[in-house]
Amino acid sequence: MKHYYLKTLNVCETLIPHRLLKWKAIRLGPCVGQVGKFICIGLNYSDHAKETGMSIPPEPIIFAKATSAICGPNDDVIIPRNSEKTDWEVELGVVIGKPAKYVDEASALDHVAGYCVINDVSEREFQIERSGQWVKGKSCDTFGPTGPWLVTPDEVGDPQNLDLWLEVDSKRYQDGNTRTMVYGVAHLIHYLSQFFTLHSGDIISTGTPPGVGLGQKPEPIYLRAGQTMRLGIEKLGVQNQCVVADK
């Protein structure tokens, strides 16, 4: 036996442990390589907008995340120096499979290569309190865990009916469904393509449901070194991250 599928590894490990590579010790990289654009959508769940004290936007809020923030789904998340407000956001990632320019909403999903889990890690002080654009609070190293899998549209079905969740130290903070998006995947692809061409390998991170640290009551809760995050989306797999301080 020369090749193993991950879904059969537990069985193989039991049957032939002396011949199976210890796959659990292997780093899994991001599920998309050579990402051109990393596009994010802000306040795209109505209840998330409410918890942040912001109104529902009349059009999608678009911002960029540096591609250098992308890392594997189980890599450590590094809290930047001088950060006290690093936060979590589980999001549905949409990966473009063929160029989209001025596409209509009806055909927009034809341009999707697949879907994945993204943790849109955010530093709220850098993002909100330091003036300017959001990009500096969204683009720190390791602030874009992506994967584990890139799942094709035929396997996913309706992208507007997927459960997504996130836990910190085994406590569930986010528990939502993509059906409550303000702007669905097809509309986002259509909308973005009116302003610039979407190319193969571009990622759209479609926003997060309520339950982020910023929205916790009676006061916000932020990540600390030594904590763990576990997050996932129905049909797309699970991520696991340790939170560490920048050295």
What are these regions (language model features)?
Residues 36-39, 59-61, 75-77, 84-92, ...:
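Generic beta-strand structural signal
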Residues 100-103, 155-157:
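Short helix-loop capping/hinge motifs at secondary-structure junctions, enriched
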Residues 27, 31, 48, 54, ...:
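Catalytic-pocket segment enriched in acidic/His residues
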Residues 55-73, 86-88, 223-235:
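Structural signature of FAD isoalloxazine-binding scaffolds in flavoprotein oxidoreductases
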Residues 61-80, 100-101, 142-151, 210-214, ...:
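Short catalytic-site patches enriched in acidic/histidine residues
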Residues 101-116:
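N-terminal accessory regions of nucleic-acid-interacting proteins
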Residues 1-60, 228-230:
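N-terminal non-catalytic cap/leader segment that marks the start of a structured domain
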Residues 65-67, 74, 81, 88-98, ...:
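Short, structured patches in soluble enzyme cores that scaffold and shape functional sites
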